[in-house]
Amino acid sequence: MSDLQRTWAKAKFGASNDPFDEPQEEQGQDVLPELPEPVDDDSSSASSASSVSSTGTIIPSPNQKLFARPQGVARGRTLEQIPWTTYFEREVSLKSEQDPEVIYHAYLTSPVGKGPLFVMHHGAGSSGLSFAVVASQIRKRISTAGILALDCRGHGSTYAPEDKAFDMRLDTLSSDLYNVVQLTKTEMSWPEMPPIVLVGHSLGGAVVTDLAKSGKLGTSVLGYAVLDVVEGSAIDALQSMHTYLSTRPLGFATLQAGIEWHIRSRTIRNSISARTSVPALLVFNENDDPTRPWRWRTNLGATQPYWEDWFVGLSKKFLEARGGKMLLLAGTDRLDTELTIGQMQGKYALQVFPEAGHFIHEDLPEKTAVSLVDFFRRNDRTALVLPPKVSDLIKQGKRV
């Protein structure tokens, strides 16, 4: 860039928010911090998140760096893995009597007292650690909150025989999530089910919506939040899935190289999130290519027969299921007609983060946590103060 162009850019956007400057996040950090402070990489504060009550056009502020060039890792920044123990109390392995060959794996921090339980389901190809950083941000705001983030079958550390690992039908995944919630309650000896907020990203959004619509968890579900997936745009995006899979690397020389690729390609735009979640996406296997032994754990191509099944009818179910509803998107262009009408009718809450990529909760964990906590508080039944019954007032001798 010429000096003239840089001068113009600074005059246009402000010297302190030059979108063409190299990123300064974690500069000089060359060791893994014991407890890294999970923050949104975006320079704007959590209070600046775009919240809309209609489907009007949103104009992002200049400091959101929407057009920043894909960058490598800044000099001095560490790429060391951050362990799951930084964010969760324990990991659990759960076996269902209905399907004992499948051993579910999940990360858990138990709720305290009457605190809520955020039950989280990741997207295709991801893992429960996708929600690690946002989980810590939720607990900063609600210290009694619990977090349950499972690894879907065929993903993460959940084990299933080969013939069952990729039974990725939507009703199977919905049953899996229900089983994990019930088995966790039994495993932890909870006397009753805590109030639940279901949270799902991408494929996970379809799963939590299906479970909410089924009503299996009864009145314990306060509401459900869906992250960056709607029926229309999801089905359209399936057309380019093969192109995406063919262009990403088949493997990486080191775990750190895999983390760096996710940051450089802006697949994940927050280095703390990438260092936490990416290691669970890869597995060491030098049989295919010793020079790139870190391979993808999940064969996304094998899930193709189920892609349309995941999303067909999603908008209708999302609007019809009982409980509070929230949709978090990276752009209003993702709304389809059915959801646009539903938004105009006030049927659900809509939050838009135009500065985020598809992995909203990883790119902007603090802002996502603020939205989820506010969503819970709006739907928290224990916070409701009901007026006294007329019969009780009469018994007390009061005039009515």
Curated annotation (Swiss-Prot):
Report if keyword Cell membrane is assigned. Answer: no
Q: What is its EC number?
A: 3.1.1.89
Which InterPro entries does this chain map to?
A: AB_hydrolase_1, AB_hydrolase_fold, PPase_methylesterase_euk
A GO term for molecular function: protein C-terminal methylesterase activity
UniProt region (Disordered), positions on chain: 1-72
Could you tell me where the Polar residues compositional bias lies? 55-64
Q: Where is the composition biased (Low complexity)?
A: 44-54
Q: Where is the signal peptide?
A: none
Coiled-coil regions in this chain? Answer: none
Q: Which reaction(s) does its UniProt entry say it catalyses?
A: [phosphatase 2A protein]-C-terminal L-leucine methyl ester + H2O = [phosphatase 2A protein]-C-terminal L-leucine + methanol + H(+)
Please note every region of biased composition (Acidic residues): 19-28
- Keyword Ligase on this protein? no
What are the protein's UniProt keywords? Hydrolase, Serine esterase
Main enzyme class: hydrolase
- Give the positions the UniProt entry annotates as the active site: 202, 228, 358
Physiological role: Demethylates proteins that have been reversibly carboxymethylated. Demethylates the phosphatase PP2A catalytic subunit.
Name the family: Belongs to the AB hydrolase superfamily.
Specify the protein name: Protein phosphatase methylesterase 1
